[in-house]
């Protein structure tokens, strides 16, 4: 496991990174097809109310035991239910920021967000399930982590 305390800032994706399962796949497909903040909010509300997600337990453990500031970055529209889910998953004393980009261009805007943070935080770790986003961010000289390697039952 990587020591997250060695970094100045952690930038972490949510869907298919910290939480995963059928509903996160449905969220992804619905956002890509309809680009509807309202539909996204309804699906997030259902996940929040009925706990319709699985948590990447190893990643949760790493984040909860790190003192490094963390920003959760999502391409979806802003939703209070995203914040509620993160509060349920993380330890009560673990602070975080949530940044909802509401964009179709995550492969451009996520690395751009990291680039903007580099002036204040020279050592950043990006945790994201997207190969494209990790590759674009790694080109900036930022460390990246593929969270799929931390999932239970993952086989190489």
Residue locations for each model-derived region?
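Short beta-strand/turn micro-motifs composed of small residues
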Residues: 74, 127-128, 148
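Acidic, PIN/NYN-like endoribonuclease modules and their adjacent C-terminal/linker elements
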Residues: 138-156
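Residues at the starts of beta-strands that form the adenosine-phosphate
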Residues: 69, 123, 143
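Short, charged, surface-exposed secondary-structure boundary motifs
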Residues: 107-111, 153-156
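Alpha-helical substrate-recognition element adjacent to the catalytic core
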Residues: 2-107
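Conserved Lys-Pro-Asp/Glu-containing loop-to-beta segment of HAD-superfamily phosphomonoesterases
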Residues: 109-132, 137
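Conserved beta-strand scaffold positions in the cores of enzyme catalytic domains, especially
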Residues: 98-100, 126, 144
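Short, aromatic/basic amphipathic alpha-helical patches
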Residues: 83-92, 117, 135-141
């Amino acid at each position: 496991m990587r020591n997250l305390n060695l970094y100045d800032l952690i930038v972490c994706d949510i869907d298919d990174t910290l939480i995963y399962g059928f509903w996160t796949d449905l969220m992804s497909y619905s956002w890509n097809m309809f680009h509807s903040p309202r539909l996204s909010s309804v699906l997030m509300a259902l996940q929040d109310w009925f706990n319709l997600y699985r948590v990447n337990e190893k990643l949760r453990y790493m984040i909860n035991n790190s003192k490094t500031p963390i920003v959760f970055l999502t391409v979806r529209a802003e939703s209070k239910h995203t914040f509620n889910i993160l509060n349920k998953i993380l330890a009560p004393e673990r602070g975080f920021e949530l940044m909802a980009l509401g964009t179709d261009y995550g492969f451009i805007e996520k690395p751009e967000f990291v680039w903007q943070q580099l002036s204040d935080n020279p050592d950043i770790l990006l945790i994201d399930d997207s190969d494209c986003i990790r590759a674009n961010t790694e080109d900036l000289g930022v460390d990246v982590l593929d969270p799929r390697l931390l999932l239970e039952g993952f086989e190489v």
